[in-house]
């Protein structure tokens, strides 16, 4: 059956009518329909779930004359199945029984109590603990884009207004949302197609007036001026849709979402999608996390610290006051790393626990972990009290103390609580007198049954008599079959077994009712007390969130202090003068994976030396040298120490990389097209304060075309844009650029060749390389010897041609490839319009004289 929810359900059974009405409210997502100890799925949902979860597809009777496809999962294992579905981009509506089966006439009342989507999950079983899980919304109008992100597991709410497609693509790549909401008339589908968790939303959800109203209601404000977003209309359209979606799916208040922040381009160093990919900040080129900058730098001891560090890496700040404060804190903490990290490790993921507290989905073990985090605060305060640093003391103040809340949780929650409050045994003995009384009554059953058994044996003289309990029949007195005929007259038969009879007596029945009542009342009271704990904790939510943020930042800074000490990093100096000066710089990732010592190299970029033409052999280290420069700059601008002996760095507004490329087959773009698209982005957007890495521009086309393009790009970057540029090339003709342009210098990475072997020195030297060593590298790669021999012969032939001919052509006539088309001469235009077959001999002679006059 294809589900169609606009028709009459009357020919279905009452239970299926209830299901179909609920399903009609959530037609596009899976519905988990609670039936006893299982969540059931029916019809198309069952078919989809059986494929996605690899569970059995069965049939359940018939409704409306048709068998019903059905699949089910045990309720106690639901989180595991939800995790699988969420990881595949699916959303699920959870439908629970809310009525009492004992009093219900017809199907038990049910309703959808929550909707689980990839971008709105907060349960720790469904989340990657060291990675942000973002819900995002995108909006577009004629002036640009609006973009909003929310991490519901922390309450972090951000918006931005990317001006163009490239900036928007970079934001999507940086934030990598788990779920992306877009308007039904969104024009740039090519920008988002293929992304996970795409959700098409109606236009009215993006209306600006509705958005302002929603946000003011959420924050309890009259306007949004205090958040600095009042005039960000495109961003607010996206934020309004996002907030509406969260309210629709969570179906509860969201007290932990207390503010919204505008992210402005001018506040951070801008990196486009290609740059983030090429620098392998948190993901390597193969899509993994090994051998990335984060893999080397992230030794944080809390999940929330790890997530904050990754946010810093993807959004380096330009405010040098913030950066110097971080540097000072790192320096001040270096002597206390070994004492602080073990204590911080015990804090855990307080940030996400607080989000679950706000959503009222926190479990008993969440509260136990919160208590454990509070118990670490006195030790952290004591250790930080002696650190002579204003930023450290500011962090210490934000951490707070929460002694009263710690005392509350120590009194209220047992040391090792069960997973769920419905299991009972969560509230500690002594916390509530009435609960202790009900528990004592329930727990005293064993003593009573022992006494009853002894008394009845003595009274009846039956030595096989014993008292017991099972979940189906309750309490009973059991007598063997051989003695059952001696049972007293007041014994009422309850159950017959193969070798025994079971009885009940009024006294035991009365006690059974009392015990079962006490257990039920104890569980109900325990649930009530647990809910009251939320009411006692939530008024402190704002201070608790501030504390969690301070603890995460402390973890990041202590981690950076440890990394600086362990990896021999130095504190960079910021200057207002443009340029980058590095002494003995190292690649932070490559030096960790090498078995031999890394060869450190210097770098000097300044207004007088703003472009380096880098030549040298393949595998000589050109790309490593370029990337290490960008990574050192990136680390400096998150406030970290850097892998070098000394670094002085001026203002940087953007980092661009045009390093390596691959075919973009999905978009129908060749390697060369990808390369040129990235190059065009750099030439349009780079400024004199940008750091630009250009590697092997011009590959993938003919030699002269490639050389001409490389020459023109270098010329544009050096003379017009004046960006700080590292330009690696195998076109040796480009080494003549320093003679023709100011601010350009040659450097090279050397190698030693001996016979058929080659040794790479990996050391950067001034001047151009003497040769490429391409044949030696080919031999090293295992190219057959006869091919290498023939290549040497051909090389000698080509080298017999004047080596400067190509450069002369590129500098002169060949550059016309990139110049504007020349105007067509009048003589040529006249000839193009001439029809020679229609001319008489006299007219032909006249045309000769006319053309002569036009030349």
Swiss-Prot record:
GO biological process: mismatch repair
GO molecular function, one term: mismatched DNA binding
Gene Ontology cellular-component annotations: cytosol
Binding site for ATP: 616-623
Gene3D superfamilies: 1.10.1420.10, 6.10.140.430, DNA repair protein MutS, domain I (3.40.1170.10), MutS, connector domain (3.30.420.110), P-loop containing nucleotide triphosphate hydrolases (3.40.50.300)
Domain of life: Bacteria
Keywords associated with the record: ATP-binding, DNA damage, DNA repair, DNA-binding, Nucleotide-binding
Annotated Pfam families: MutS_I (PF01624), MutS_II (PF05188), MutS_III (PF05192), MutS_IV (PF05190), MutS_V (PF00488)
SMART domains the UniProt entry points to: MUTSac, MUTSd
HAMAP family reported for this sequence: MutS
Family: Belongs to the DNA mismatch repair MutS family.
Role, per record: This protein is involved in the repair of mismatches in DNA. It is possible that it carries out the mismatch recognition step. This protein has a weak ATPase activity.
Name of the protein this chain belongs to: DNA mismatch repair protein MutS
Gene: mutS
